[in-house]
Swiss-Prot record:
Family: Belongs to the universal ribosomal protein uL10 family.
GO cellular component: ribonucleoprotein complex; ribosome
Gene that produces this protein: rplJ
Name of this chain's protein: Large ribosomal subunit protein uL10
Keywords (A to Z) from UniProt: Ribonucleoprotein, Ribosomal protein, RNA-binding, rRNA-binding
Function (record text): Forms part of the ribosomal stalk, playing a central role in the interaction of the ribosome with GTP-bound translation factors.
SUPFAM superfamilies reported for this sequence: Ribosomal protein L10-like (SSF160369)
The organism of origin for this protein: Prochlorococcus marinus (strain MIT 9301)
Amino acid sequence: MGRTLENKQQIVTEIKSLLNDSEMAVVLDYKGLTIKEMSDLRSRLQTTNGICKVTKNSLMRKAIDGDSNWNDLESLLTGTNAFVLIKEDVGGAVKAIQSFQKDTKKSETKGALFEGRLLSDSEIKEIASLPSKEVLMAKIAGALNGVATKIAISINEVPSGLARSLKQHSEKSES
């Protein structure tokens, strides 16, 4: 027995909600993947705040209809698709997908949409090579800490230099 109209509307509403919270969508051809392999992909994506959703292309079309951020996704809606919706750690999620594909050698990336723009395969690979948000924040914090340390040393050096000059001057006066 097929899905009811109400059930389909709930699915479309859920997909719209997921898309509103997502920064990027990656479309995978999941043909030939087992349930265990799909579960493996989902668990890999969990750490990066990504969600793998398998739904009919017609329901995805209804979900993106009228949404300018996701309209270009329509060109990828053919065949058997799994949609990876990424909320935060885009680079980490793309790395997880590529690692999964390397391990299973079954699924292919059909394409991705980021900030309303379709990405080429090379652009998707570039995103995977980016450091995570935590690494970038650590680098910025380290750079800021280095600047603060240099300023503190410079500020401390002025009175120290003055004290050395006064000491030398007093030693000259005593001799």
